[in-house]
A protein has these predicted regions:
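Short, small-residue-biased leader/transition segments that mark boundaries at the very start
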Residues: 1-3
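Sparse, context-dependent recognition of short Cys/His-centered cofactor- or disulfide-binding micro-motifs
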Residues: 6, 29, 59, 67, ...
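Glycine-centered flexibility sites
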Residues: 8, 30-33, 84, 242, ...
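Rossmann-fold NAD(P)-binding glycine/threonine-rich loop
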Residues: 8-76
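Conserved aromatic-histidine-acidic binding/catalytic patches
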Residues: 32-39, 58-62, 84, 220-223, ...
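Soluble or luminal CAZymes and related metallo-dependent hydrolases
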Residues: 39-43, 88, 227, 295
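Internal, well-ordered domain-core segments that constitute the primary functional module
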Residues: 47-118, 124
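Long, compositionally biased stretches enriched for glycine and/or charged residues
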Residues: 101-371
Length: 372
């Protein structure tokens, strides 16, 4: 689900670009993630209100980004049982398995954090002699210069924080303040960062759609039905049959991770069976990982607050605290950018689209504080 579809996505890229703020995906954090969250949360709440009336005991399996913002808002505003599902944990495990030359079926791992910024706390395999830690093999990939060209950002973060992050390099590069700089094209080249990547994907998908549709409709070229590593169908199967499975899900932090805020959306292993979806307690994360996550959690928290209360000032504050936005723009630029985006999205942000009145109120408030 993408609220306002391609026009909304293009707006989230093109207006920030006028301020010199470049993005890669813009669907999870950053100014693009904030705007996408503000457009999406009200629609998901409408879905949940329908569920409250029609199927109050059902589970909502959410695949929609910005995952953490969406699930956090739903956990606060509706009793519908929600789990957010992503493929970054199991997908990255498969990628690392290829990098180190170990079959993924032989690997066991424990991963925890927030969506798109969870880390493998353990990455290992059982051997005849016990358990082998596979992190030395990952470090060897770096030492031997075998880092894939498309994955340089994540491997760089790994060398500095000591654990490997789940989400892709193009995503990660816009969650932190270090890799995308408007006056540092050398960084873009060094880390092979695909700016405007989401727009490129949209254009490719649109261009290819007619061909894909013809292939799908032709029995000779129709896709074979095979299970992927996505969790949705297996969760439904376990809930209905009782067959136990462990999946990685995004749920409210109810004493699951000690050094992240209670109530925040966290990504942890969850046992699924006929008893429901049961998250696993992790305890405390390594302090450097929790500190890095908090730079993202702060933005998520204020965006959710804005979506649920309609208070425009929380949008400004979320943008000011966003690591990438704050590294590129000053406060006045950030305020102006937020105003421009809200105006451009118009009726898609009805709680905030009072336009000139809101801007005038903000200016008066700002002037009053300055004069005081």
């Amino acid at each position: 689900m993408c609220i306002r579809d391609r026009p909304g996505t293009v707006t989230d890229f093109e207006i920030p670009k006028k301020y010199g703020l470049r993005q890669t995906i813009a669907d999870t954090l950053g100014i693009g993630g904030i705007m996408r969250g503000l457009r999406t949360i009200p629609v998901l709440l409408d879905v949940c209100r329908d569920m409250e009336e029609l199927c109050p005991d059902a589970h909502l399996l959410n695949y929609v980004n910005p995952m953490a913002m969406n699930c956090w808002a739903l956990s606060r505003a509706t009793p519908i049982r929600t789990i957010g599902l992503c493929h970054s944990v199991q997908g990255t495990a498969e990628q690392l398995a290829r990098d180190i030359g170990v079959p993924v079926a032989d690997i066991n791992y424990l991963c925890a954090g927030i969506n798109h910024m969870a880390f493998y706390l353990r990455f290992e395999r059982r051997t005849a002699d016990g358990v082998e830690d596979l992190y030395p093999l990952i470090r060897r990939v770096v030492a031997e210069g075998r880092v894939p060209d498309w994955n340089r950002t994540r491997y760089d973060l790994f060398t500095r924080f000591g654990y490997f992050v789940t989400e892709s390099s193009e995503h990660l590069s816009e969650y932190v303040p270090w890799y995308i700089k408007r006056d540092r094209p050398d960084l873009i080249a060094r880390y092979n960062i695909p700016l405007d990547e989401y727009i490129s994907r949209c254009e490719s998908q649109i261009a290819a759609w007619d061909v894909i549709r013809q292939l799908l409709e032709d029995e000779a070229t129709a896709l074979a039905v095979e299970r992927t590593h996505e969790y949705g169908s297996t969760i439904i199967h376990s809930l209905e049959t009782g067959q136990p499975r462990v999946v990685y899900g995004n749920v409210a932090n109810d004493h699951l991770i000690d050094n992240l805020p209670q109530g925040a959306c966290v990504e942890v292993p969850c046992l699924v069976d006929r008893n429901g979806i049961q998250p696993t307690r992790i305890g405390a994360l390594p302090p450097q990982l929790a500190a890095l996550m908090m730079t993202n959690v702060n933005v998520q928290s204020l965006t959710v607050e804005a979506a649920l209360t309609g208070r425009r000032e929380h949008i400004y504050q979320a943008a000011m605290l966003d690591p990438h936005t704050a590294a590129e723009l000053d406060p006045e630029q950030i305020y102006a950018l937020v105003d421009d985006l809200i105006a451009a999205h118009g009726d898609w942000l009805p709680a905030f689209s009072d336009g000139d009145a809101a801007i005038a109120h903000r200016a008066a408030e700002h002037n009053g504080q300055a004069n005081g």
